[in-house]
């Protein structure tokens, strides 16, 4: 069966069976996706993003295999498992078809057909199905006894048995299924009396569109409204055509028996078949929409986590506000809290001179290099206030997304970090740290609270969590972490660690001081050879005695670099420092049965830029000073903005006011765009033009087409 899995995954993904087999072997051996992707390229044939797809396909096939086992056991217990049926089940890997095969044998709650069978009406149903008897009423009279009160009662029971038979027939189900697939219409109507409550869904009050053309965001919006009891939703094909197809299959005579069967077919379609297939399509379309939404969310999260960091600078974090003032914190270059203060530069208090004096004192005393202002209430006013002041030090001012900061400030992680401070201080610290290192700070927050998803509360939560966790893990390992400063929460996402080992590393660091080498990791309690293999390459030690400990070169490959240095008559440190020496390296000399060119290329790239951060430098940004509210917007106005969220129908842009504007997919570029990520990315600075403004619904339509500069 495992070999069958390899063949099926290979066919589905267009990857060789050998690559599938090797990759699954590594996964089964406990290797993580980041480790395999980075350090086992020779084994997998250079697979990267496909590794996750291989794992997902394998898990789905394994689930199907378990389901088949359950089905076979159930039918076996009924004594109905024939060799032919067993072979058919074993050869079927399509879940829908598998359930169709199983349906006649599936244990049921008491149905109308089952009740009719218990009354002894199955022979009558069989007689009707043969459609040879000219006078079925006369034959039905012989069944009038006990609970069967009259002839019509007998015929009705027989029709119920036929209706169930029709609904469980594979060909019949496929016929109706094909009709749904080709011509299924999704219809939504507002629930009577709920018009006012459902205002935000008014686009769907009387909606009718092809299911196969319905975009995922529309489908999820409709399903959300349905769940809230505001819309009635249905999916339907051409009912007449479906019934005609079924009648052609089951009705073979125009006589009285044929008429009974035709009546049973119509009942079967309306009462059993159509609702069953409608549920199937509702589930499948929702699953597809979920997958698309989760994919969008994961990509947005990836871009957000890989946003450019300011780095190890002294930062002032400000959580702005009007009535309650602005909470200000000062952080050292490692993000440790040095000081916190409240200032009140805005109405109703308006103590601007006092606020400036406090800021001046903090900036000088703590040698602040940059200020991070949260982008919530009073953000623009606070930015403007700071930019109008002349401080004795040059400082850069940044606007930082504070989405999820309040969630973090009330979390256990925040309480453990700052047990003696309230939520306002913790929130301001989070804003400051997000500027220094977005990745290290955002991993502390449930990704669903970061606000870059599309209907994230409506999709399958288990699948969403799995995808987002894998995204965080991929990002953390792509960047790597400083072994001597990383929090236990950040370390948790490092390949091969997890919560317990991450905490053990932090405890070891607290008791023994900073790590001086990667080898020292082996002294951490419960750190075995396998965990070390998986994590070591992603952990950096900037001041280590061995310079390779601050690179992505894995300890298992140190001997290769050492041999390169030896062959050139220099030390490893000299090799890293001297570009001319590195040019003399002939990588093919270091090939071996276990080390191929992919690994050697990665090593040489790492020696070129040891410990390189893939995230790039941060840029300062300014909003238009003349736009403060939605009422300041005019059609045709051009504005600077920052992409805050991406969906499959476009991108939402922060233009410095409370409401974000939407650039629809069709307005991202002159050319056809199928995926917004082809044009924009999270946190990208863009220039946009205002297309329309709906102040009542707080909706702003923007375009990037025909924008100057």
Please provide the spans of the model-predicted regions:
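Generic start-of-chain signal for non-secretory N-termini
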Residues: 1-21, 28
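Structured, non-catalytic alpha/beta "coupling" segments that mediate domain-domain communication
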Residues: 74, 99-101, 225-238, 248-273, ...
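Duplex nucleic acid-engaging cores and interfaces of nucleic-acid transaction enzymes
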Residues: 50-53, 60, 64-317, 323-421, ...
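A glycine-rich phosphate-binding loop feature that marks nucleotide/adenosyl-phosphate handling sites
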Residues: 178-185, 318-322, 376-381, 400-407, ...
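Long, highly charged, low-complexity intrinsically disordered interaction regions
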Residues: 2-5, 56-81, 90, 416-514, ...
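Single-stranded RNA-binding regions, centering on S1/OB-family and related RNA-binding modules
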Residues: 541-709
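Short, ordered loop/turn segments at secondary-structure junctions
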Residues: 39-41, 129, 238, 320, ...
């Amino acid at each position: 069966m495992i070999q069958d899995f390899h063949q099926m995954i290979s066919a589905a993904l267009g990857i060789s069976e050998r690559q599938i087999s090797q990759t699954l072997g590594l996964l089964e051996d406990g290797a993580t996706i980041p480790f395999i992707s980075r350090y086992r390229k020779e084994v997998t044939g250079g697979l990267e993003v496909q590794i996750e797809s291989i794992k997902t396909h394998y898990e789905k096939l394994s689930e199907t295999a378990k389901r088949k086992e359950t089905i076979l056991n159930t039918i076996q217990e009924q004594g109905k498992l024939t060799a032919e049926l067993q072979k058919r089940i074993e050869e079927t890997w399509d879940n829908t078809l598998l359930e169709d095969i199983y349906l006649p044998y599936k244990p049921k709650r008491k149905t109308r057909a089952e009740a009719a069978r218990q009354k002894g009406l199955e022979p009558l149903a069989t007689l009707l199905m043969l459609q040879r008897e000219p006078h079925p009423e006369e034959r039905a009279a012989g069944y009038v006894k006990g609970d069967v009160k009259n002839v019509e009662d007998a015929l009705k029971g027989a029709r119920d048995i036929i209706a169930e038979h029709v609904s469980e027939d594979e060909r019949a189900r496929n016929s109706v299924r094909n009709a749904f697939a080709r011509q299924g219409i999704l219809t939504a109507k507002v629930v009577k009396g709920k018009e006012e409550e459902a205002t935000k869904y008014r686009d769907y009050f009387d909606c009718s569109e092809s299911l196969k053309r319905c975009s995922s965001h529309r489908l999820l919006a409709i399903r959300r409204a349905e769940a809230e009891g505001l819309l009635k939703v249905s999916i339907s094909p051409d009912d007449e055509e479906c019934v005609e197809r079924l009648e052609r299959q089951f009705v073979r005579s125009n006589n009285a028996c044929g008429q009974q069967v035709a009546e049973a077919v119509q009942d079967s379609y309306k009462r059993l078949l159509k609702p069953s297939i409608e549920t199937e399509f509702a589930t499948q379309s929702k699953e597809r929409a979920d997958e698309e939404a989760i994919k969008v969310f994961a990509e947005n999260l990836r871009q957000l986590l890989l946003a450019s960091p300011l780095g190890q600078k002294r930062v002032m974090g400000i959580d702005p506000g009007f009535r309650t003032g602005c909470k200000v914190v000062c952080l050292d270059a490692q993000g440790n809290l040095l000081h916190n203060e409240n200032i009140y530069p805005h109405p109703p208090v308006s103590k601007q001179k006092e606020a400036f004096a406090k800021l001046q004192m903090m900036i000088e005393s703590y040698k602040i290099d940059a200020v991070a202002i949260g982008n919530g209430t009073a953000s623009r006013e606070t930015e403007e206030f700071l930019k109008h002041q002349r401080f004795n030090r040059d400082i850069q001012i940044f606007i930082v997304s504070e989405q999820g900061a309040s969630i973090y400030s009330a979390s256990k992680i925040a309480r453990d970090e700052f047990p003696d401070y309230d939520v306002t201080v913790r929130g301001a610290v989070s804003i400051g740290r997000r500027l220094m290192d977005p990745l290290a700070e955002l991993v502390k927050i449930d990704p669903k609270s970061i606000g870059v998803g599309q209907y994230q509360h409506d999709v399958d939560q288990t699948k969403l969590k799995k995808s987002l966790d894998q995204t965080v893990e991929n990002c953390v390992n792509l960047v790597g972490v400083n072994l001597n400063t990383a929090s236990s929460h950040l370390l948790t996402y490092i390949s091969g660690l997890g919560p317990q080992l991450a905490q053990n590393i932090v405890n070891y660091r607290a008791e023994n001081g900073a790590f001086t080498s990667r080898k020292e990791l082996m002294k951490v309690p419960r750190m075995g050879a396998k965990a070390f293999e998986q994590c070591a390459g992603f952990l950096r030690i900037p001041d280590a005695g061995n310079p390779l400990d601050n690179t992505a070169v894995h300890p298992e490959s140190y001997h290769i670099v050492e041999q390169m240095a030896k062959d050139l008559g220099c030390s490893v440190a000299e090799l890293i420092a001297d570009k001319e020496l590195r040019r003399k390296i002939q990588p093919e000399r270091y090939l071996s049965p276990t080390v191929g060119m992919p690994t050697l290329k990665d090593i040489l790239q790492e020696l070129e830029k040891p410990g390189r951060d893939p995230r790039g430098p941060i840029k300062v940004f300014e909003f238009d000073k003349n736009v403060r509210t939605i009422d300041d917007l005019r059609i045709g106005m051009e504005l600077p903005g920052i992409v805050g969220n991406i969906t499959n129908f476009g991108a939402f842009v922060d233009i410095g006011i409370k409401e974000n504007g939407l650039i629809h997919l069709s307005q991202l570029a002159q050319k056809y765009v199928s995926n917004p990520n082809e044009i924009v990315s999270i946190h990208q600075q863009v220039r946009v033009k205002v297309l329309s403004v709906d102040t009542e619904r707080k909706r702003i339509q923007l375009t990037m087409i025909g924008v100057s500069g």
